[in-house]
Swiss-Prot record:
Protein name, UniProt field: Dolichol-phosphate mannosyltransferase subunit 1
Name of the coding gene: DPM1
Subunit structure: Component of the dolichol-phosphate mannose (DPM) synthase complex composed of DPM1, DPM2 and DPM3; within the complex, directly interacts with DPM3. This interaction may stabilize DPM1.
Main location: endoplasmic reticulum
Pathway stated in the Swiss-Prot or TrEMBL entry: Protein modification; protein glycosylation
Principal EC category: transferase
Length: 266
């Protein structure tokens, strides 16, 4: 029997699937975009983010697939994903679960093995990253022929919403320190909303050794080392509505250790 989250997801997904497809968008018909969505306890958020993704891609006539990598969520996220896969079809929604929580970096490694697009988009499944920015990412990539396009909270009209002052100070402080120590050539080193050429992401994954949230930081640092080009698009980051943040004391300690390791080795 489907979970309540799956039922809500089915209704939203059916509405999105019924939306008409307007004229051709800005991306080439030959291009395909694979979205990697790592999930852990995202039953409430998953139907909404998938609905928004489908809406954004459909309105822009962009060829896409959404790959859900669930790490053994105990809240029924996998069952919701199975329902979404049935609604949209396995050519659009690909559930590629793992049996337990193995970390963000390895989730991307697992997901890219199943990606058939020539571009890969990584983003959070908790609604912190709105899919409405994806067409802007694609336009930016085409205009500058960039290898990577990264969403930034710290440039132009970018910003963070829903965080208290303490968390904003910690985020700004962490980003400032990374800019001083690593000089990454990007304004938002810890962000996780990005578009990559598939072959570039594969190469970076081979080079990166970090785990968890530090993985995102190392990806940009290694990209600079390999002379990959990076474009940026200002985004609005909104704190999650459903569920709890996975950023805790252990993640902060890991971040500091990872920062020092990257400083010493790059």
């Amino acid at each position: 029997m489907a979970s309540p989250g799956a039922s809500r997801g089915a209704s939203a997904a059916t509405a999105a699937a019924a939306s008409p497809r307007p004229p051709q968008g800005r991306s080439s018909r030959r291009d395909k975009y694979s979205v990697l969505l790592p999930t852990y306890n995202e039953r409430e958020n998953l139907p909404l983010i998938v609905w928004l993704l489908v809406k954004s891609f459909s309105e822009s006539s962009i060829n896409y697939e959404i790959i859900i990598i669930d790490d053994g969520s105990p809240d029924g996220t996998r069952e919701v994903a199975e329902q979404l896969e049935k609604i949209y079809g396995p050519d659009r929604i690909l559930l590629r679960p793992r049996e337990k929580k193995l970390g963000l970096g390895t989730a991307y490694i697992h997901g890219i093995k199943h990606a058939t697009g020539n571009y890969v988009i990584i983003m959070d499944a908790d609604l912190s990253h709105h899919p409405k920015f994806i067409p802007e990412f694609i336009r930016k990539q085409k205009e500058g022929n960039f290898d990577i396009v990264s969403g930034t909270r710290y440039k132009g009209n970018g910003g963070v919403y829903g965080w208290d002052l303490k968390r904003k100070i910690i985020s700004r402080g962490a980003n400032f320190i990374t800019q001083i120590l690593l000089r990454p050539g990007a304004s938002d080193l810890t962000g996780s909303f990005r578009l990559y050429r598939k072959e570039v992401l594969q190469k970076l994954i081979e080079k990166c050794v970090s785990k968890g949230y530090v993985f995102q930081m190392e990806m940009i640092v290694r990209a600079r080392q390999l002379n990959y080009t990076i474009g940026e698009v200002p985004i609005s980051f909104v704190d999650r509505v459903y569920g709890e943040s996975k950023l805790g004391g252990n993640e902060i300690v890991s971040f500091l250790k990872g920062l020092l390791t990257l400083f010493a080795t790059t």
